[in-house]
């Protein structure tokens, strides 16, 4: 008789169908999850491969980004395939051991992901807002990532410990499901609130605070830089009195310089706007992708009658699984966007990816060297300007031209730096007044801004 009952039993989703099993739901979600799986895995594996292939890229910031990419890969492998299967078929096919292990690893990867986003925001905050404080070292970054994994494991441990594989008790239903089984509903709800705070509220608050301050500081520095360029231009216009006997090229050089200064101002404004947009996107995207999933989980947790998501009070109109799939897929889109926001938008990294996969490896090494040399050169050039060769010839016309150029250069340097500075005799007007002058006479805070912007964008 027992054999007959077992033979006649059916799986849960056939006895209690719901909208998540509709072909109109399965096909779109299958497409979305396949897209998130392959694109997320490709993006994060590429990020890890390119960064680890070039030791010069193992900076403090990139160590945290590597940590983020590793957790994203874990979510792509474990959360993206398994969660939709269990939501649609309401059955656990992976055995008792994996009932404890897979949810544990899923939880750890999610916590490491959100904790890493908070760590990246804090590191950038210290670099930009508190530039004179001691920055985190590579060793400190590695220790921080280890602590993040340990903390994630500790927070996830109660969840994994209380997971159990339970057999369906109804006679006509056969199969098992893997679910939480706590001693009391009170303890389960308390843990749910802790998870929501640790996984969403705290990281979101940290990111919002850090990036709001970074945007404020970078905007002020951009305004200061533009103001200095305006003062520099005014000083040059008032200092350079060109002779009226046919030296029109001087006026052409001045006009050319003014055009370059105007383009440089526009570049600073656009770069600041772009950086602001990226930082705001990071915070907003994290909020809109993780908030719905947390809200749905919270409602399900406190819905004792399990009727909140039942339309018309009917079991076959229970949309809780459908909503859970929808919000989960939105949350998992972070796996695709994180490599884009934190790596691909960096032009240097983008070139490295292209050169690594499609070009000469030596060219990608040169990109790294050029980036590091460029940042070093900014600081070095504040102490010394390398001029070109003197203008040759000893005629009166050439001598007059040289005196006028030197006079403009001396007056310009005085107005820019706020104190008398003897320029290198070889430096000419069209060299001193190039767009790079804003970097050559930049304050320490401005230099920090350039290097941090390289990291941000």
Curated annotation (Swiss-Prot):
Extracellular side: 1-22, 84-100, 162-193, 301-324
Any single GO CC term annotated in Swiss-Prot or TrEMBL for this entry: plasma membrane
Localization per Swiss-Prot or TrEMBL: Membrane
MF-aspect GO terms: neuropeptide binding; neuropeptide receptor activity; neuropeptide Y receptor activity
Tissue expression profile of the protein: Expressed in neurons, including neurons in the head, the ventral nerve cord, and the preanal ganglion.
Cystine crosslinks: 99-178
GO biological process: behavioral response to ethanol; feeding behavior; G protein-coupled receptor signaling pathway; negative regulation of protein secretion; neuropeptide signaling pathway; regulation of muscle contraction; response to oxygen levels; sleep
Keywords, in A-Z order: Disulfide bond, G-protein coupled receptor, Membrane, Receptor, Transducer, Transmembrane, Transmembrane helix
Predominant location: membrane
Membrane topology type: Multi-pass membrane protein
CDD domains assigned to the protein according to its UniProt record, in alphabetical order: 7tmA_NPYR-like
Keyword Metal-binding: no
UniProt cross-references to Gene3D superfamilies, sorted A to Z: Rhodopsin 7-helix transmembrane proteins (1.20.1070.10)
Keyword Disulfide bond set for record: yes
Membrane-spanning ranges: 23-43, 63-83, 101-121, 141-161, 194-214, 280-300, 325-345
Cytoplasmic side: 44-62, 122-140, 215-279, 346-457
Protein function: G-protein coupled receptor for FARP(FMRFamide related peptide) neuropeptides. Activated by FARP neuropeptides flp-18 and flp-21. Plays a role in modulating social and feeding behavior. Required to modulate locomotion quiescence during the sleep-like state called lethargus, which occurs during molting between larval and adult stages, in part by regulating touch sensitivity.
Family: Belongs to the G-protein coupled receptor 1 family.
Stated name of the protein: Neuropeptide receptor npr-1
Species the sequence originates in: Caenorhabditis elegans
